């Protein structure tokens, strides 16, 4: 009898725990994805803060030339970064217990792998949590689908690209200047500016900014006034009101006359779908482009593609970009190899005499 009561009590305790985890009445929804999201993001955040402040220099290129990234080792907010795991580690899983000491783990850039892997797990679970909360509330699942774009982009630069290049040392450093360095080196090695998927991403981000500004300004300019002239029109909105807060017909008429009739949406639902889909699809394509360039399927090469009748090269902007790429290639990792791959692979010119 005692055993039966104890079993009921424990089952009830588990049931209460499940109800609390999945309750939509909590101030912040936890969910089953949140059970994994909370510890992984807390771990990534806390290790990032500690390492950004105090991590010792990291031998990123595996040539016994450590690079400093933390504030206590001479950096500021702009130049500081979590330095990627050493090329000597490559793609090996490198937890603390795989190193001979904590000093060795820090020297080889172990914190980078720890932060990145926990961060990617955390943001993936955040996306799952968005879907889970939408499901509990009877909403459609498109919030999580939209969030998949930045998740895909982060996964591309922190995981897929290092896998394709063979080392976590090629991942994006976790800092401002480190991000710029990653972008410059990526351009030098893969010519990303000439990749059509990157072009789609630029159109997605800049277009999304433009459409967001256009939509916000149109709505703000066509509010239905519920206040006197002496009060702000914004004060006329009551949270949860059933009435439309702006006149979509007026906004449609304005924009249709500004551009042309069919450039303006007359359906609020398709308008907002478009506002969400445009940047999301663009960022999906960029993430896909990074993932293909990870395996060296690079941007277009139009170098020396225009020649005159005598066979002399007429330079185009593609040749100017190529010259810049060579300069960036020469300057990065300048002690890791004697010649950049692009230059070392060119046959030596013939010398007469």
Curated annotation (Swiss-Prot):
SS bonds (residue pairs): none
Modified residues (N-acetylthreonine): 2
Residues at the site labelled Stabilizes free radical intermediate: 190
Cofactor note text: The D1/D2 heterodimer binds P680, chlorophylls that are the primary electron donor of PSII, and subsequent electron acceptors. It shares a non-heme iron and each subunit binds pheophytin, quinone, additional chlorophylls, carotenoids and lipids. D1 provides most of the ligands for the Mn4-Ca-O5 cluster of the oxygen-evolving complex (OEC). There is also a Cl(-1) ion associated with D1 and D2, which is required for oxygen evolution. The PSII complex binds additional chlorophylls, carotenoids and specific lipids.
Listed Gene3D superfamilies: Photosystem II protein D1-like
Catalytic activity reported: 2 a plastoquinone + 4 hnu + 2 H2O = 2 a plastoquinol + O2
GO cellular component: chloroplast thylakoid membrane; photosystem II
Top class in the EC scheme: oxidoreductase
Subunit structure: PSII is composed of 1 copy each of membrane proteins PsbA, PsbB, PsbC, PsbD, PsbE, PsbF, PsbH, PsbI, PsbJ, PsbK, PsbL, PsbM, PsbT, PsbX, PsbY, PsbZ, Psb30/Ycf12, at least 3 peripheral proteins of the oxygen-evolving complex and a large number of cofactors. It forms dimeric complexes.
Family: Belongs to the reaction center PufL/M/PsbA/D family.
Function: Photosystem II (PSII) is a light-driven water:plastoquinone oxidoreductase that uses light energy to abstract electrons from H(2)O, generating O(2) and a proton gradient subsequently used for ATP formation. It consists of a core antenna complex that captures photons, and an electron transfer chain that converts photonic excitation into a charge separation. The D1/D2 (PsbA/PsbD) reaction center heterodimer binds P680, the primary electron donor of PSII as well as several subsequent electron acceptors.
Protein known as: Photosystem II protein D1
Gene: psbA
């Amino acid at each position: 009898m005692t055993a039966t009561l104890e079993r009921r009590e424990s089952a009830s305790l588990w049931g209460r725990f499940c109800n609390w985890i999945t309750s939509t009445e909590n101030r912040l929804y936890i969910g089953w994805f949140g059970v994994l999201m909370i510890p992984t993001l807390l771990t990534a955040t806390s290790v990032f803060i500690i390492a950004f402040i105090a991590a010792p220099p990291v031998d990123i290129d595996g040539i016994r030339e450590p690079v400093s990234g933390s504030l206590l080792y001479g950096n500021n907010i702009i130049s500081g970064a979590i330095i990627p795991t050493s090329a000597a580690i490559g793609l090996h899983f490198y937890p603390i217990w795989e190193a001979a000491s904590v000093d060795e783990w820090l020297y080889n850039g172990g914190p980078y792998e720890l932060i990145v892997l926990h961060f990617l797990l955390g943001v993936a679970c955040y996306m799952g949590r968005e879907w889970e909360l939408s499901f509990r509330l009877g909403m459609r699942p498109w919030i999580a689908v939209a969030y998949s774009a930045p998740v895909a982009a982060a996964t591309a630069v922190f995981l897929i690209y290092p896998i394709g290049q063979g080392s976590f040392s090629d991942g994006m450093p976790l800092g401002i200047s480190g991000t710029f360095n990653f972008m410059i080196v990526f351009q030098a090695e893969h010519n990303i500016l000439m990749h059509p998927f990157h072009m789609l991403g630029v159109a997605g981000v800049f277009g999304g900014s433009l459409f967001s500004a256009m939509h916000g300004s149109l709505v703000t300019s066509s509010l239905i006034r519920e206040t006197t002239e002496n009060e702000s029109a914004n004060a006329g909105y009551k949270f949860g009101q059933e009435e439309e807060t702006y006149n979509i017909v007026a906004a449609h008429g304005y924009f249709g006359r500004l551009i042309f009739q069919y450039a303006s949406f007359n359906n609020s639902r398709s308008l907002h779908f478009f506002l969400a889909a445009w940047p999301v699809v663009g960022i999906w394509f960029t993430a896909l482009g990074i993932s293909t360039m990870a395996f060296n399927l690079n941007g277009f090469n139009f170098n020396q593609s225009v020649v005159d009748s005598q066979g002399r090269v007429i330079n185009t902007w593609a040749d100017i970009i190529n010259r810049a790429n060579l300069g960036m290639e020469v300057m990065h990792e300048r002690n890791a190899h004697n010649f950049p791959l692009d230059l070392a692979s060119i046959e030596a010119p013939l010398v007469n005499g």
